[in-house]
């Protein structure tokens, strides 16, 4: 169980670094919407909703809600 959590955290950190590098392109590509920051990109990629901060992005990624 711990290994799964660690793997998830690693994946999220890699996505966050990609977001910082590509300016939200990854989130836009996967979520189908424009993203300009790390939180928005992450939320758009997994939750498919607009997010403008890291907390919102995480919420969109996990629950698909604000």
From Swiss-Prot:
Modified residue annotations for Glycine amide: 31, 47
Localization (cell): Secreted
Region (3 X 16 AA tandem repeats of [FI]-G-G-G-L-G-G-A-V-G-G-R-R-R-R-D): 21-66
Sequence repeats: from-to residues: 22-37, 38-53, 54-64
GO MF annotations in UniProt: toxin activity
GO (cellular component) term, any one: extracellular region
UniProt tissue specificity: Expressed by the venom secretory cell of the spine. The spine is a cuticular structure containing a single large nucleated venom-secreting cell at its base. It is an independent unit capable of producing, storing and injecting venom. On the back of D.vulnerans caterpillars, spines are grouped together by 50 to 100 to form scoli, of which there are eight in D.vulnerans.
Keywords: Amidation, Cleavage on pair of basic residues, Repeat, Secreted, Signal, Toxin
Residue ranges annotated as propeptide in the record: 33-37, 49-53
Signal sequence, renumbered to the chain: 1-20
Job description of the protein: Probable toxin.
Family: Belongs to the limacoditoxin-59 family.
Name this protein carries in UniProt: U-limacoditoxin(59)-Dv128
Organism name: Doratifera vulnerans
């Amino acid at each position: 169980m711990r290994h799964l959590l660690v793997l998830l955290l690693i994946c999220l950190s890699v996505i966050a670094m990609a977001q910082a590098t590509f300016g939200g392109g990854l989130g836009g590509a996967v979520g189908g919407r424009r993203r300009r920051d790390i939180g928005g990109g992450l939320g758009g990629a997994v939750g498919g909703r607009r997010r403008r901060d890291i907390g919102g992005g995480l919420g969109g990624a996990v629950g698909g809600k604000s």
